[in-house]
Amino acid sequence: MLPRHSLIPAACAVATLLASAGTMASSHREAPFITGMPKVDGTDFYMFNSYESGRDGYVTLIANYLPLQDAYGGPNYFSLDDDAIYEIHIDNDGNAEENITFRFQFNTERRNLAVDVGGTSVPVPLINIGAVTGQNNDAQNVLESFTVEMITGDRRTGNVQNLTKAGSGDSSFAKPLDNIGTKSIGDYEAYADNFIYDVTIPDCPMPGRVFAGQRQEGFVVNLGEVFDLVALNPLGARDSRSNVIADKNITSLALEVPADCLTGDNTVIGGWTTASIRQATVINPGPQGSDTTGSSNAKGPAVKGGAFTQVSRLGSPLVNEVVIGLPDKDRFNSSEPKDDGQFATYVTNPSLPALVEILFGVSAPETPRNDLVTVFLTGVPGVTQLPTVTASEMLRLNTAIPATEVGAQNDLGVAAGDFAGFPNGRRPIDDVVDIALTAAEGFLCGADVNGEAAGGEIGSCGSQDMQVNGGAIVNDGALPDPANYLTRFPYLNTPLPGADNVAVAE
């Protein structure tokens, strides 16, 4: 057995990890249907107590979408979907239904900027025709903006109110241009800071902050070897391989909210993100107008209508990627936590440890995996359990556990004694792949995270009521680098530029 003090981290991490017991890009292209809709593909969800200096008492929520962006991906780059809604849901009473939802909706304006060519004004094919700054976007051909609504109660029938810019009442926020290159945007970090807004949140006495825009991918994984039948040394050095998605960008929807405006009767909250699109799409065989000529008789390439229908869902990392079986991946993306009983077998009898046993001869923990059910579906008593216990998959955070300062954070989170990390919420630095692999191999079997105090029992692995496989740290060889993250909101790093022209002669 591990020392009592080291079980809490592991316990929290176990559920989330075990569920994702494999290792891969947290939720990038994880289900067959969503691979054809990258703009609404949720890739990672972070929820943690803010650790920026002076932000005690705040919770940061980050939902990432549109995976594996190449920085040079012009000429259109990576706008989000105007015909979709992107949502972050909070359950603060434990009934596996949202009590609060933050809904992001985007709007794209095409200016149809033109240049004179032989006396004829001709629209340009690029999204900018010159340098752009936070104060001057005259050369920007495509503008994105967004609104954020707070819905209390059911996401579709509850009370809807707008978040607004603090001091102005304006409910429209601008999204920065993607990082095209240093000639178009000279200092992208300073440029993007202009799009971090202080916001007034309905029924909340303190302001929050919001940002939506491109960031450097923060998830770390040795992707290719993991998916090639785990072609790596799982007990080797944690930095023996490379993070193959380190050169990718992502689009983040980031929101910072006072913790007291999220919690219910105790200090634990559950969270997840979803994206929904219109139910029907009709393709226009002869598009014209707004996307081409700017005609008043604009007819775009498609007409969309009908009710919004959920196509992406993400709470704890890696769940749909490596826990849910292939036949049910699309179903999981369309489901809600309150209905997660239908997926229970994937948690009680996970396939990943069995696959590892076949590939490496390492004995899989016995089933049923009651340890995973506790940490992953119900929360750990006294740590991440909500007032009402409803078995459901979501990321859980105890807002009363103080944030760990940047220099003291451990990327193994709770498993290494850093109780402010995964699976008590999830920070950008948390190496969820290593945590998940370790938990999957029985790290938490029979653990009691509260020692002699009441509660804290994790549960057994079948008849095994103590740690399995010696508590080894199983890893993919890709290690997070603290230098690749910001120490302030929105925490994920400045996106990589599509071109670095600093050495190009004028």
PLM region spans:
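Bacterial N-terminal signal peptides that target proteins for export
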Residues: 1-11
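Hydrophobic helical h-region of N-terminal Sec-dependent signal peptides
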Residues: 11-18
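N-terminal signal peptide c-region/cleavage motif recognized by signal peptidases
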Residues: 20-22
